[in-house]
């Protein structure tokens, strides 16, 4: 466990969170007064991007937390 790079894991987690926030903001920007099907589809696609970014952020968080648990608790 001595070779685990906690700074890198934390950095990966923070980048993933930033990407998730950016995806949320992009989705939010598409919620507008244009009620056309095209705009709705763009909004839906942005929602899928939010879902994907959330999944990546949670995986990065889990990798970081798992490494910390192994270091601090031995499991």
Residue ranges of predicted features:
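Short, charge/polar-rich alpha-helical segments
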Residues: 1-18, 47-48
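Short E/K-rich amphipathic alpha-helical oligomerization segments
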Residues: 17-48
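Short amphipathic alpha-helical coiled-coil/interface segments
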Residues: 13, 43-57
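Short alpha-helical scaffold segments that flank and stabilize functional sites
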Residues: 19, 26, 49, 56, ...
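Long amphipathic alpha-helical coiled-coil segments
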Residues: 31-42, 58-75
């Amino acid at each position: 466990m001595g070779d685990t790079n906690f700074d890198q894991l934390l950095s990966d987690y923070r980048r993933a969170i930033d990407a998730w926030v950016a995806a949320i903001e992009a989705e939010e920007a598409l919620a507008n007064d244009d009620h056309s099907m095209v705009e709705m589809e763009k909004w839906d696609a942005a929602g899928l991007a939010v879902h994907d970014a959330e999944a990546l952020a949670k995986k990065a968080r889990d990798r970081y937390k798992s490494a910390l648990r192994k270091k601090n608790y031995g499991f």
